[in-house]
Amino acid sequence: MRKILLSEAIDDSGIRLLEGRVEIVFCPEPTEKAIGRLIKDADALIIRTAGSVTREMVEGAGRLKVISRTGGGLNNVDIEAATDYNIVVCGVKGPQDRMVAEHAVAFMGALAKQFFYLDAQVRKGNFASRKEYRPAGLSGKQVGLIGLGRIGRIVADICIRAFDMQVTAYDPYVTPETLGSDDIVLKEDMADVIQAADFLSLHVPLTENTKGLMGTAQFELMKPGAFLINTSRGEVVQEAALVDALKNKKIAGAGLDVFEDEPPDARNPLFELTNVIATPHSAALTKEVVAQLAKGSAENALNVLEGKKPSYSPNWDIVQAKLG
């Protein structure tokens, strides 16, 4: 019986799909050392956000045919190495998109209304805070989107339709012809989007081009009253530059679901700032979506083992061509 290694536990919907069809092996912890030790005898690996798959691990995995992610981001897998060894890398796209978009918009509302600050004041007995502070509204505000893929477009749709906000966007892979919307203003220069935004929301994958995308120069362009929203990947933002921008009031605040290092150190200076709202990379993790992602990743792994194309894979065609 073929063997599937799970780097972490997944929802029961995925387990039920695997049971009786493959031998399931659970990794004791999602570390490179633990995964690397057990991957040597596995035909497939299902991996979540924690842990990573390196070239060294792939080189030692003689039986491995597929690496299946419980999500769409594949930045914790060395895809080039996997392709060199004819291993299909696949992920699940779709179920999480709306949830991540909702999370980004919720950050906007919470930051503009200062829910967390005012909640703390009320709990302290400072009901007079209602006179001391004036939250902002969303209607008519400018939303800047960096990245206009599936999630970015949903964010734009919610902001425009629900809150009557104005949306500008930068995405080098989107043209006015492929945009298909008269409601979104597409800019050729990212700086134009950053400068105009009251809320700057990041929706890009982590690549060599997007790593460190937001640094000191970019924060200098933002309005002093603007907020940064990041539900994409932590390494897209240079955290030291963000801390400096927040402390020196170059921007008004930030809503962060992702961090440069995950899990972040509890002493991370971002957590000392009252104008930061942080969540634990949980934007997509609703009960329904977690089940769909687990099932989708299990289906992808089984399909590849049976010679069928997975729902999403950046290297399926390349591997199939190599195998003839």
Can you annotate each of these PLM segments?
Residues 1-90, 215, 221:
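An N-terminal-biased, well-structured beta-alpha scaffold segment characteristic
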Residues 2, 25, 97, 168-170, ...:
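Structural/interface elements that position substrates and couple domains in central-metabolism enzymes
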Residues 3, 23, 142, 165-166:
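Residues at the starts of beta-strands that form the adenosine-phosphate
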Residues 8, 28, 170-173, 232:
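N-terminal Rossmann-fold cofactor-binding loop
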Residues 52-58, 172-269:
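Rossmann-like adenosine-cofactor binding region
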Residues 85, 93-142, 154-162, 312-316:
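Phosphate-binding beta-alpha-beta segment of Rossmann-like dinucleotide-binding domains, i.e.
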Residues 148-149:
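Glycine-rich Rossmann-fold phosphate-binding loop(s) that bind the pyrophosphate
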Residues 225, 231-324:
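Rossmann-like dinucleotide-binding domain for NAD(H)/NADP(H)
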